[in-house]
């Protein structure tokens, strides 16, 4: 019995690089053909608050589970369909009950700040999702942000809520292998054995594929069911994600799983390659800087696109931002820090003193 499943989140996390503006027909085909490739779990997009998002199609920012119905194939057995809800960005009380015609599961993400400041409300959202009948995936954003003690407190909450899965999330692409080993060990040894571990990484250090193999190896020692996230071509903001095609190939050739790799290649050629013409993702030194400073990718994108800065300068400005603020994005603050940094970097005192020596007391006509 296989204990590893793949969750493809191209239409959700991959789509962030194009503001999730997938044409409806493309969303339908990507979803359908991922199912044909025997991908276990397909994430079709976000669920957002209809008071803030006006859904008119051609987007995977949905506001109602009924809008997702055309993009799931209920005739394909063995496939789970999910949507992602960020805490505070959806009206959870208007979520329609599960009826078997749309998504099967909801991945629910919250930050440490959310949990520290609004713990009771975060737990209420968790309970609402379960009460509505959906399989629940709990994603504590940025796992590295928790101390071991804090993470164990979250695991206690997870054991009580008893979701389908709980995630190790490398939100800012900042993990190294020892971080993965430590987090996996803590969770695996303290979480109920029938709750899956869901691993989601970003490729800032070009380690996503290595991490996936490590988590698979670790799961073999405990018979834990695990879920590995990926996107087609690694599509995603800045460094992007684990490539779905890489983990598919690994599991087919090394573990004798039965995914259809050729179907994945066709999806890449038919739908993903075209996005690389206007949108860049993958490893870069700028992406590395985002990992080093655990920074929201939008900060790096803004500094790169607006100011055309060198990687070293990007790192210097990121280091000037408060660590907690760095995990969000505030363009006004970045503008202010950029001006401050450039002012300090451009030190013209030496040039002025040299001119004074040359000119002396002579008059200058400009």
Protein language model features and the residues they cover:
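Catalytic cores and adjacent flexible loops of soluble metabolic enzymes
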Residues: 1-366
